[in-house]
Amino acid sequence: MGFLKFSPFLVVSILLLYQACSLQAVPLRSILESSPGMATLSEEEVRLLAALVQDYMQMKARELEQEEEQEAEGSSLDSPRSKRCGNLSTCMLGTYTQDLNKFHTFPQTSIGVEAPGKKRDVAKDLETNHQSHFGN
């Protein structure tokens, strides 16, 4: 089962490692400067790569078919998910309600109008400043 879950990246990396081992530790500079003929695959490697790619494509096709079947089963009107999120606005409203609830239950900070600390009375400050100018 695990063999069927190879990703294309893993297959390519295995082939690259195989090619690197077949070169028997040739310095990187000589690999980069070498002719493109060294990068060709043998007939057996080509068949192996084609078989791996074909198996991978079949596996992905089966997974897509299974997902489509599950979506078809899940899209029935009896499904609780379709009842719960039958209308996009209902789902969005639920999401916004949850976010708003998180905002209100978030711990308060000591910044803002209702922050603890010295409270100033603007009217008293204006009277004090006004009286000091007139010398009362």
Curated annotation (Swiss-Prot):
GO terms for biological process: adenylate cyclase-activating G protein-coupled receptor signaling pathway; artery vasodilation involved in baroreceptor response to increased systemic arterial blood pressure; cellular response to nerve growth factor stimulus; detection of temperature stimulus involved in sensory perception of pain; feeding behavior; inflammatory response; intracellular calcium ion homeostasis; negative regulation of blood pressure. It comes from Mus musculus (Mouse). It is found in: Secreted. Keywords: Amidation, Cleavage on pair of basic residues, Disulfide bond, Glycoprotein, Hormone, Phosphoprotein, Secreted, Signal. GO terms for cellular component: axon; cytoplasm; extracellular region; extracellular space; neuron projection; terminal bouton. Belongs to the calcitonin family. Residues 63-84, 114-136 are annotated as: Disordered. Residues 116-130 have a biased composition (Basic and acidic residues). The modification Phosphoserine is found at S42. Residues 26-82, 121-136 form a propeptide. The modification Proline amide is found at P116. InterPro entries: Calcitonin, Calcitonin-like, Calcitonin/adrenomedullin, Calcitonin_CS, Calcitonin_peptide-like. Pfam families: Calc_CGRP_IAPP (PF00214). Disulfide bonds join C85-C91. PROSITE patterns: CALCITONIN (PS00258). Calcitonin is a peptide hormone that causes a rapid but short-lived drop in the level of calcium and phosphate in blood by promoting the incorporation of those ions in the bones. Calcitonin function is mediated by the calcitonin receptor/CALCR and the CALCR-RAMP2 (AMYR2) receptor complex. Glycans are attached at N87. This is Calcitonin. Residues 1-25 form the signal peptide. GO terms for molecular function: calcitonin receptor binding; hormone activity; signaling receptor binding.
